[in-house]
C-alpha cells in the first residue's frame, strides 16, 4: 500500500478539488469517510468505513490522505466528507485556538461543545487511545547519554539536528511553543520532512531528534526512545470520530456504529496496527478487517 503521496502536488490538488462546489447528485444513500495524510489517520478512516459498510446498506466512499488538519476541517464543513478521525488536543489548539488543558475529560468536553455550537459537528466516543506528539531520539543515544526527559535533552540539543512534519512546525501547539517551553536550540534550523520518513531518518543518523507520535509502530522496531514531556507542554490527543450533525440526522444508525468503536483501540493496539502497515508493509484493508474481526465487530 502507498503509505502517503510522495509529491506535494497530489495533496494540494486534492485539497483544491475538495473545496470546489459539488456537481454530484445527492448522496443521501452514501457516506464519505475522510482521513489525514498519515498512516494512523488512514487506518482509523478505514476502520470506520469498514464498520459502516458492514452494518448498513450505505455505499461508503473513501477520501483519504487529505493533507492535514485544516484541509479535513474545511472538507467536512463544506460537506465534501461526512466523517473523519481527529484528535482532541489538535481540535482544541489548532482549530478552536484555545489554551491547552492537561485533563483528557476537560479537553474532550470543551471540543465536543464548541464543535456542536460553532460548526454543527458531533464528536463520537473516543477510540480508546491517546496519540500525543513524541520527541524521539535513538535508543543508543538515550542509554549512552543517560537522558529520559526533554528537559535533560536541552543540554545536548545544540549538537543535534532535528526533523519535524510541516504541520508541527506551523501549529500553535507545535515547534515554536515546544522550543520556548524547554529552551530548545538545535545545530541548525529543523528539517521539515514527511511524517513517514522521520523515524527512519533518525535511525539512519540523518537527524538526531524527530517529532513523531507515541503510537508510531516503528518506535520499538527501530529502537527509538521517546523523551518524556516533563513540563507537560502537550495536551491530551484522544483520537475521536468527527461527524456532521446533518449526516447523523439522515443516518442515525451511524451513531451506534461509532459508539461500538468507543474504547476499542488501546495505545498498544494502535501502535501494532501502525507497525503492521509501516513496518511489515501489509495491506491496510486486510489489517483493519482482521482487527475488527478479532474484536467481534464484523464477521
Regions found by a protein language model. Give the residues of each.
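C-terminal motif of bacterial Sec signal peptides marking the signal peptidase cleavage site
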Residues: 20-22
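Ligand-binding cleft/hinge of the Venus flytrap
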Residues: 48-56, 150-188, 290-297
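Short helix-initiation/N-cap motifs at beta->coil->alpha
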Residues: 59-74, 188-200
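Alpha-to-beta junction loops
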Residues: 77-86, 158-160, 177, 202-212
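Ligand-binding "clamshell"
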Residues: 95-124, 204-206, 218-232
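A conserved helix-loop-strand patch within extracytoplasmic ligand-binding domains
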Residues: 106-161, 245, 263-267
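An extracytoplasmic/periplasmic, membrane-proximal ligand-sensing/linker region
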Residues: 169, 173-184, 252-299
